[in-house]
Amino acid sequence: MRATLDNPKFTNVATADEYLADEVFGINVEVNGAHRFYSYQILNWHQVVNDNFDGKNLTVTYCVFCRSFAVFETNKKFDLDGRVYNNNVLIKDRENNSSWLQIRGLSVIGNNVGEKLNQYQAESITWSDFKKLYPEGEVLSTDTGFVRDYTRHPYASYDTIKTVYFPLTNFNDVFDKKDLVHGVDLGDVQIAFSEYIMRNVPVETVDYKGHKIVGFLDEVGVIRIFKNITLGETELDSKYLPKNVPLDEVLDFTYDPKKDLMIDNQTGSKWNRKGEVIEGPLLQKKLKQLESVETFWFCYSAMFENAVIADINAIEFNKQ
């Protein structure tokens, strides 16, 4: 069984750069403006890190089979359960041995069945991007107390081959098994944004069953999903409102590749990758970012059998 890390040690960017590969991804966690990087090079071997970051008790988790990460703000301490469901690892809390699905933070076995953990916002980026964006950040150290070769993947080329190790209850073959998607759970519906699609269309606005959301793909390949708003909800002064556009029309966006910005087509305001207006009539407006999961498609389609997929035009949804 993979060994959990408790009270992990951290190092600086310069030291970590000696052993981390530029192209390898990891989890970027921000607390009060400070950043920590938990590299998959290390998480491949451990998968659960119980940490305290500037007073916040966080459990950082990674499923090596689904390539899914999740960070939870919780006082519970977790270990790997040793079992999987649809290839997603179960984690077990030490307090009462309840088992939880890693990708959903949902208790499925034990005294806490049905309870959900509080997900803490985080993102997956490459080491190359992290060290450029956050040169003062802290980095999970290889000084873990365990003897591991952190320069290699314990499952070799698993991330790039088509093989899936364990049975699936469902698979939707609209994408290849190991295509990456970002999914958001809206209660009555789950919506998946495909990295494959968004590399060509970096912004997708959707209005489905009353849910208004928009996905942005930023310059370092991170997909962020936000709750969208209507023109009326912008509270824009009437003198700036476009003519003949109904107030209940949802904002739609166009990507400007030269400036790496999103421009809403109703007001011409310019939005950055964090969902913030930096120029235009809606200056200082900010969209609310929604919790989402990043994982291989085979895992998401098995976990959320009725999930719908934002298509390339972000107008319709396909379920095949």
Q: Would you name each region that the model predicts?
A:
Residues 1-320:
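Mid-to-C-terminal functional-domain signal that highlights helix-capping/loop sites
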